[in-house]
Amino acid sequence: MNVITCRHYEELSEKAASIIAETVKQKPDAVLGLATGGTPEGVYKELVRMHRSEGLSFRNVTTINLDEYAGLSPEDKNSYHYYMNTHFFAHIDSRKDRHFLPDGRADDLDAECGRYDRLIQTLGGADIQLLGIGHNGHIGFNEPGTPFESRTHVVELNEETRQANARYFPSIDQVPVKALTMGIGTILSGKRILIMASGKSKAQAVKQLLDGRISEAFPASALHAHPDVTVLIDEKAAGGD
């Protein structure tokens, strides 16, 4: 693992964006594996700035997202479809038909997971996969105990994860109880992985990730089996004040 420590969140976001931008410049038809949540927001903001100010084009890029809530329509403001459109897709020159996310409204969620995983395999996996990390080491919605060889699947969201995401919803009761997520094996099929952590609240998870012990009890530890992982953290996530 290559660990890069940045001074603060803004620098962290700029560094992550520069790595993704370099991937696109080297391979204009790159497959970008994307994540949602608070941590990547600054990355998308910087990529949009680079598109507008520096001419970075996403015209030939394909995107695949990690996950989506079950039961939410793409127009729902809490769906990850809506998040991606709001923070990124609506502001760049990419093609709408090249953005792929799991369909949380599918009649058969298990079949949808199989379809999505086959799509990712057909695309050859992500050229670069962006990840965040949960306090318990979850990546995507892969909670502790998820097999490392898992493929895209339906997951029951545990109480800790629902509480962590409750700030985006009017109440905890409205947080979905299920989601569709790339499995750990699917994530590991990416050619390069970029995992980000920001803030003191993520310091313990970062410490556990970097101590090198591999266990399904800490999903992010699976990344030690991947040959090209960059860990981007700010000073607070590194354990500093």
Curated annotation (Swiss-Prot):
Its EC number is 3.5.99.6. One of its GO terms (biological process) is N-acetylneuraminate catabolic process. Keywords: Carbohydrate metabolism, Hydrolase. Pfam families: Glucosamine_iso. It catalyses: alpha-D-glucosamine 6-phosphate + H2O = beta-D-fructose 6-phosphate + NH4(+). One of its GO terms (cellular component) is cytoplasm. The active site is at residues 67, 136, 138, 143. It comes from the Bacteria. SUPFAM superfamilies: NagB/RpiA/CoA transferase-like. HAMAP family: GlcN6P_deamin (MF_01241). Catalyzes the reversible isomerization-deamination of glucosamine 6-phosphate (GlcN6P) to form fructose 6-phosphate (Fru6P) and ammonium ion. PANTHER family: GLUCOSAMINE-6-PHOSPHATE ISOMERASE (PTHR11280:SF5). Belongs to the glucosamine/galactosamine-6-phosphate isomerase family. NagB subfamily. This is Glucosamine-6-phosphate deaminase. It comes from Bacillus velezensis (strain DSM 23117 / BGSC 10A6 / LMG 26770 / FZB42). The lineage of its organism: Bacteria, Bacillati, Bacillota, Bacilli, Bacillales.
